[in-house]
Amino acid sequence: MARSRSNQIGGQPGKINSPRTDTLTEKFICDGGEIKTVKARDLFLLKGNPQLNKDHFTFSKNSKYPYFTRTVFNNGIYGYVDYLDEEHLIKGNSLAVGMMAMQFFYMEHDFYAGQFTKTAFPLFDGFDEKVALWFISWFNKSSKKYLGVLVRDFENEFYETELLVPYKSGKIAIDFIRERVRELEEERVRELEAYLKVAGLTDCSLTLAERETLNNLNSGG
């Protein structure tokens, strides 16, 4: 059951406060939005992944399907593989987690996975990469707690995780989440570009890949 909170969302996602994001939140509240404390079990379904060792796959830089493992590098993706079968294929637009580091990553496309991994599937409409970053920040904030329990107890610990989620008219405020995450991403890029200028590296600019890496770091990945 969700509990309403009248206060703003402080420091999430990305643990950054700025006048722009604070103003965005204030406007959201004034327009009838509210912040609710919701347990993960109300928003996600956690499933163990059908697992296959990497020896079962053919890896290639031109392959289509990500192979997700316990690594925390490259968004948990060990490499890309050719299609194998439907039995082991995991639906994308979901959150994958490796049980060793307990770090969550957004998986846009259908994927295969190795041992000791699970996937959280959203139970609500409108889920995408921007919305995923919001929830990843909360789940990764709980990584130390997850690491402190036995693997067999992780599912219950995950479902009991409390999340602050914006709601409007009885539904998750997807548009607000996307806008706020976008503002936070832009804020971090401005901070880094300001640092480069102070450091005398004004001829440097961030590539698209570097911006994506920065956003992943901001989300706790």
Residue ranges and their predicted role:
Residues 1-52, 58-75, 168-221:
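Non-catalytic DNA-recognition/assembly elements of restriction-modification systems
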Residues 36-162, 221:
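DNA target-recognition domains and sequence-specific DNA-contacting regions of bacterial/archaeal
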Residues 164-166:
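A short, hydrophobic, proline-anchored segment that marks a local hinge/packing element in signaling
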